[in-house]
């Protein structure tokens, strides 16, 4: 990206590339100073700032991308670690539990002050405590306590993962245009008047109060407002567990923990654990998870098809600004200008630091903005009319207009209403044929840019000469009421021996 100082001067926004490199700068020393300053700043930081920095660091990590590389191996490790601990507890600690807890069944003679007075008795008790068997059993006792701590930690970890999977990922959607709400558990009614109020502060107490007391109260209060549908909206709480939590839940499932915790674990139990892990992964990840992905792909394909077949053909029509010469001189000049509207092309207008207006267009092939030159730019200039241009040199400018009007009179239906019939004085109801240039085209019909719209020509309201009106009525024996005024006009300019059909008909009637 670049910063436009003027139309001709632009500066790159990334100023790091413009800085000169220092040959005496040691990158290793700079990194050491940076780490030292960070380490020193930890002692001057408030604990609340530590919490904010830690949460920001956790939230900025893309956990979904680490679901296969981190979540799945970690969950499987927890599951098999739980299996190994339970196997050692039942096969190693439980058979020797009586030997491990032997000191708790009688008095500890080593702590007796009376026995210490007798050296031979004290020596006997000291040798017994230092025997190999006693050391082994003491080691098993400490190992059993370590196994108990591991079982408690793994159980709490599994409970936390289960809670985050089932109740820790919800998104609320407000449905304002849904008239009849579905009968679902996670869909509730709410008033539009309380839309900006925070009813739930998100605390544990408010959640418990909602589940124990608030559910029935809200359902009863919303049922009374079924008639007034204009003041309510629906809230949908969608369950959206992340891919990382889902993979961690599947690989370290609570069903496996409960199964290993309440059954006799042996070496054959490993087969059941492996089958359980495979079935759960196949069911949730491979089948149901891929089904959701496939449905989203199908929905995206349907939207793309609707956009390609329905939206784009109607919203992105290929139009172009046109300037048409509508003067009576019949020059037939047509200028095609590029469309400068934002809904037709990727065109943006910005201002430089000096206040100059810059028009840029986005080039999808290069992914860059390019300047668009709009001053004096025309395309496809047509200067010759596509029909008999030579006739325009001998006839008046309205010859084609009058012939086209009278040619359409024979095919024009009779208008029963009081609407004005299309005549040459109302040419707006007659459109030229496609692909032909006609002076009937209005000067405002071909352009959408106001700055390109020319003034209306004063010659458009000029009447044709009386001598050329003979071509308007080339049929004989017509009883149209319009013939009488035409005859009067012609009698002023033509001789009595005219051989027109009008004069012959009048001569026969006089005779």
Swiss-Prot record:
Gene Ontology CC annotation, any one: nuclear membrane
Listed Polar residues bias regions: 439-448
Localization per Swiss-Prot or TrEMBL: Nucleus membrane
Residue ranges of the TM segments: 146-166, 255-275
Start and end residues of each stretch annotated as Disordered: 420-511
UniProt keyword Amino-acid biosynthesis present: no
Keywords: Membrane, Nucleus, Transmembrane, Transmembrane helix
Function noted in UniProt: Member of a perinuclear network that controls recombination at multiple loci to maintain genome stability. Required for rDNA repeat stability.
Protein name (database record): Nuclear rim protein 1
Species whose genome carries this gene: Zygosaccharomyces rouxii (strain ATCC 2623 / CBS 732 / NBRC 1130 / NCYC 568 / NRRL Y-229)
Gene name of the record: NUR1
């Amino acid at each position: 990206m670049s910063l436009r100082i003027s139309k001709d001067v632009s500066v790159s926004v990334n100023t790091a590339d413009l800085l000169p490199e220092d040959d005496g700068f040691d990158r290793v020393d700079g990194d050491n100073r940076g780490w030292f300053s960070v380490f020193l700043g930890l002692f001057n930081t408030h604990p609340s700032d530590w919490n904010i920095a830690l949460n920001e660091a956790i939230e900025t990590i893309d956990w979904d991308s680490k679901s296969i590389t981190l979540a799945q191996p970690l969950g499987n490790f927890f599951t098999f670690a739980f299996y190994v601990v339970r196997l050692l507890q039942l096969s190693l600690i439980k058979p020797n539990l009586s030997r491990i807890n032997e000191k708790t069944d009688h008095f500890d003679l080593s702590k007796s002050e009376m026995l210490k007075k007798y050296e031979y008795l004290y020596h006997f008790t000291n040798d017994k405590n230092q025997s190999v068997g006693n050391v082994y059993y003491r080691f098993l006792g400490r190992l059993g306590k370590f196994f108990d701590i591991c079982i408690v930690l793994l159980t709490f970890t599994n409970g936390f993962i289960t809670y985050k999977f089932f109740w820790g990922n919800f998104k609320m959607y407000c449905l304002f245009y849904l008239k009849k709400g579905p009968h679902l558990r996670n869909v509730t009614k709410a008033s539009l008047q309380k839309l900006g109020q925070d009813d739930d502060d998100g605390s544990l107490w408010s959640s418990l109060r909602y589940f124990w007391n608030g559910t029935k109260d809200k359902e009863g209060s919303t049922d009374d407002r079924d008639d007034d549908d204009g003041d309510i909206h629906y809230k949908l709480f969608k369950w959206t567990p992340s891919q990382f939590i889902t993979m961690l839940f599947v690989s370290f499932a609570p069903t496996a923990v409960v199964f290993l915790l309440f059954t006799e674990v042996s070496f054959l139990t490993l087969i059941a654990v492996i089958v359980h892990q495979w079935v759960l992964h196949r069911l949730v990840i491979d089948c149901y998870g891929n089904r959701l992905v496939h449905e989203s792909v199908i929905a995206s394909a349907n939207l793309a098809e609707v956009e390609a077949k329905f939206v784009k053909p109607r919203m992105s029509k290929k139009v172009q600004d046109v300037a048409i010469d509508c003067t009576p001189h019949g020059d037939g000049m047509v200028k095609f200008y590029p469309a400068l509207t934002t809904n037709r092309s990727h065109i943006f207008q910005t201002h430089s630091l000096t206040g100059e207006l810059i028009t840029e267009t986005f080039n999808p092939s290069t992914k860059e903005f390019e300047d668009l030159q709009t001053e004096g730019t025309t395309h496809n200039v047509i200067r010759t009319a596509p029909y008999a241009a030579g006739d325009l040199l001998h006839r008046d400018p309205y010859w084609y207009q009058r012939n086209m009007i009278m040619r359409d009179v024979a095919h024009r239906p009779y208008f029963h209403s009081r609407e004005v019939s299309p005549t040459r004085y109302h040419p707006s109801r007659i459109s030229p044929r496609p692909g032909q240039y006609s002076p009937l085209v209005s000067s405002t019909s071909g352009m959408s840019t106001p700055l390109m719209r020319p003034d209306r020509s004063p010659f458009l309201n000029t009447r044709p000469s009386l001598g050329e009106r003979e071509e308007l009525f080339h049929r004989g024996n017509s009883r149209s009421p319009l013939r009488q005024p035409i005859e009067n006009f012609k009698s002023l300019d033509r001789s009595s021996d005219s051989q027109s059909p009008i004069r012959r008909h009048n001569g026969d009637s006089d005779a």
